[in-house]
């Protein structure tokens, strides 16, 4: 599988794992303290080839994703579930632990930001669905993030991410039906 865009990852181990799964060029941020020089490189690559942000499903990965998104609106995003990024032994979550199949699957389900898009799902929709409060809210958000392949978020961030990626009411409804069926988990 050849990827035209440059994939932005956190470190060299992520690059190695990505290149085991697909034929792609990567750019490493070398952690969550992204320099202006690195952001300039990402912006240059975005203009020339396109960019896919593919970070770990943890706090640092989300921080990197947010920094890049704010600096360069319109980048594409690939997400791994925490399960797919879990180490087989001790350690933290990371792209470097994902199987080649999980990486290819994430890259097959990219999201492109629509920074100024109108929200298609309301905050009320999230509340009615039990995604912002209640005993199951956190678990439902986790499942929703996995099903839609948009990563885990808290209630406030979920609204922003659904808007950013223009998740449709139909996609949202199908996801809710799936995540609330206990037989699927």
From Swiss-Prot:
Report the protein name in the record: Ribonuclease M5 1
HAMAP family noted in UniProt: RNase_M5 (MF_01469)
Organism's domain of life?
Bacteria
An example molecular function term from Gene Ontology annotations: rRNA binding
Into which EC class is this enzyme placed? hydrolase
Please name the PROSITE patterns in this protein's record. TOPRIM
Cytoplasm as UniProt keyword: yes
Kindly list the cofactors needed: Mg(2+)
Q: Which organism is it from?
A: Ligilactobacillus salivarius (strain UCC118) (Lactobacillus salivarius)
**Gene name of the encoded protein:** rnmV1
Q: Where in the cell is it found?
A: Cytoplasm
């Amino acid at each position: 599988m050849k990827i035209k865009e440059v994939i932005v990852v956190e470190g060299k181990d992520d690059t190695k794992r990505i290149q085991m799964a697909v034929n792609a060029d990567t750019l490493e941020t070398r952690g969550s303290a992204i320099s202006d020089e690195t952001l300039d490189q990402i912006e240059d690559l975005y203009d020339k080839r396109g960019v896919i942000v593919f970070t770990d499903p943890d706090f640092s990965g989300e921080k990197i994703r947010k920094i890049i998104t704010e600096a360069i609106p319109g980048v594409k995003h690939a997400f791994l579930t925490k399960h797919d990024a879990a180490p087989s032994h001790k350690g933290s979550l990371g792209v470097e632990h994902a199987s080649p199949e999980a990486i290819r699957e994430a890259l097959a389900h990219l999201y492109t930001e629509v920074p100024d898009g109108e929200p298609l799902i309301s905050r009320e929709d999230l509340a009615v669905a039990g995604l912002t409060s209640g005993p199951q809210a956190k678990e439902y958000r986790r499942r929703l993030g996995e099903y839609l392949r948009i990563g885990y978020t808290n209630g406030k961030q979920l609204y922003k991410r659904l808007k950013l990626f223009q998740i449709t009411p139909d996609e949202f409804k199908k996801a809710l039906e799936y995540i609330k069926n206990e037989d699927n988990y």
